[in-house]
Swiss-Prot record:
Annotated effect of mutating C754S: Impaired farnesylation leading to a constitutive localizes in both cytosol and nucleus, as well as reduced interaction with HDA9
Residue ranges, compositional bias (Acidic residues): 533-543
Source organism: Arabidopsis thaliana (Mouse-ear cress)
Places the protein is found: Nucleus; Cytoplasm, Cytosol
Alphabetical list of PANTHER family matching this protein: WD AND TETRATRICOPEPTIDE REPEATS PROTEIN 1 (PTHR15574:SF40), WD REPEAT DOMAIN-CONTAINING FAMILY (PTHR15574)
GO cellular component: Cul4-RING E3 ubiquitin ligase complex; cytosol; nucleus; plasmodesma
Protein name in UniProt: Protein ALTERED SEED GERMINATION 2
Entry annotated with the keyword Transferase: no
Taxonomic lineage from the root: Eukaryota, Viridiplantae, Streptophyta, Embryophyta, Tracheophyta
Traits of the deletion mutant: Production of 'obese' seeds characterized by increased weight, oil body density and higher fatty acid contents. Increased sensitivity to abscisic acid (ABA) as well as salt (NaCl) and osmotic (e.g. in response to mannitol and PEG) stresses in term of seed germination and roots elongation.
Amino acid sequence: MDNLSFHDGNIFNLLHTRSQDPSHEVDQRMQFHSSLVRRLSQEQELEGHQGCVNALAWNSNGSLLISGSDDLRINIWNYSSRKLLHSIDTGHTANIFCTKFVPETSDELVVSGAGDAEVRLFNTSRLSGRAEDDNAIIPSALYQCHTRRVKKLAVEPGNPNVVWSASEDGTLRQHDFRESTSCPPAGTAHQECRSVLLDLRSGAKRALADPPKQTLSLKSCDISATRPHLLLVGGSDAFARLYDRRMLPPLASSRKRMPPPPCVNYFCPMHLSERGRTNLHLTHVTFSPNGEEVLLSYSGEHVYLMNVNNGICSTGIMQYTPGDVDNLFSFSNNLHDVESPPQVSTTPQNGFHRSSNAATVKKCTELVEIAKWSLEEGTDVFYAIEAANEVLDAHSNDIESALRHECLCTRAALLLKRKWKNDAHMAVRDCHNARRIDASSFKAHYYMSEALQQLGKCKEALDFATAAQHMNPSDADIVAKVESIKRDLQAAGAEKNEETGAGTTRVLSLSDILYRSEANSDSSHDMSRSEREDSDYDEELELDIQTSLSDDEGRDTDSNSMRGSLNLRIHRVGDDKPMENTVDNASSGTASSSQNDRTSYQPEGAIDMKRRYVGHCNVGTDIKQASFLGQRGEYIASGSDDGRWFIWEKQTGRLMKVLVGDESVLNCIQCHPFDSVVATSGIDNTIKIWSPTASVPSIVAGGSAGPATANVVEVMESNQQKLSRNRENPLSVELMQRFRMQEFAEGNFHPFECTQS
């Protein structure tokens, strides 16, 4: 949008500053300056793998790039020449999902983790030095203590002795090369290695208010570069967890399942913290370069930024509790947190003093008028939202409350018109903040009622609509809104009565569950509290299936044990009809025990989102990354199921660049430690190297498939439709992983040829 400026200043001024003051800070600001980001294009394509490239990592000085692939090989590339130095036949028997250089080893030690549940360490000094002559070498260390796929490895800067591995078995293990270089396979008679740093086999939460109970299949982990005692993990539920390694219990054996240790913080957007999102899970978590923020990427969702430490910012970021989630949707005439007038900020940002004078106010006023015009005309809604983001996220402290209130209401209305996934939840936030400024705001109440109606919360919507009608009884729109909500309530009541009369037990085939489309991605997830309490549908279903599929310690089932068709009997808790034989008395006792656990459990708080980044699609793989670009981390990048990768401005969420990087799905994004260079990979067998070589800055540039001609908004609209059609089902992620590994006799369910999940 031409009306929006960039917040990192003029690059020529930076170059002039560097000539006068050659400081490291100027170089950091130059690395991914907006003018360079908008000139990124594909520089080279690295060929050397024969399968999907699932992992990328740079060494500490950026001279080498390492990659891991479905071809079971690790490749090491020279950055300067862009040539393949080594190709290691690892000996893994399943896809390699992660690989790293071990710090302070002259880049001679590399480590890999794979789908065979093994972690392998290699010494590259034993290789021939020519990639075409490299053969399988004996690992310097071999750890076989995991029981399921190893999805992510972490190393500590400056520590050459330890590597951490996160696995779908629910454990994060610490491997110290000084203590041992091997451990026997899990489940063997002599398997007693004490390497479990985090035991989260009973750590997954259905909701913030629920106690941890199910296995948390770990998908990602990261160690803070600035505070290496901080450890971040994410997996098969909605909550990323921050741990202080100094406060964790001693390393333990995996023979006994331990209760999950307390974490420093949970991270989860407030609207994703409720029950009813069974299949929601994280695919990537990472710290910002300065360690003050974390980035979360969700499957079937967006990318979210959060503060590591609890605090308040322009978006109202805070640590919330389960009660706060309910309060956000509840009508109250007395808002206890009415906003106080903001303090005008004069803090320098990016080396330049932020304007707090009349020019800034004039600019913000113009942007709000542009957004309001787009709302009235129904055109350019995406860019109008970006204009509102610029005002609220970049200049919130520079404007008066009245203008901020107007912008909040306008953005809420635009979000409700756009209707991308969870836009209605973002509108609820804006309306809530607008009501904090003006508790008698007609617009805030009207748009809140519209947002809640879109979310299927009709009772709450009627409260706000009625209040708005009292404020302006002659407004035709609010009269129509009240009647519309009343009709929705009547229809919902009739449907509920019909279901009650027909009975609540029904038999579904597995295909019914796996391929059930959600009609409305927002409303299908957001039942009212009373409706959620009336149904324990998800938990009961998972209990039935786990009883029939799992054996004693959560070990993997035999590959032949699930052949043939599978029918599931589903019923609500409290149904008078007897349960099928899939659940025995012991399981019934477990269900009763879980209810008691939930009653006695004291809910913890979580840190809410700071920013949301939208436009990509993440449903096809669970290794899709979201990364900070540059040493200052001022830009956010994510891969997408459409083969593109997206770059946003961190501060405002403004879309900066869309690049085609894969013919199918792009997963991995790793920026160079110091240069304006990015490496990406995905389903293709090649690695793409990107640098700011385009002659003209633009939001879209040529990629591996040639110049992109599609309209950017149309591309994002298509991705949002895929997210909304994302097949939501009551099977947990843990169980879905088991089904993916099987082939049914009917031949209706087959794994992908190139599996990156």
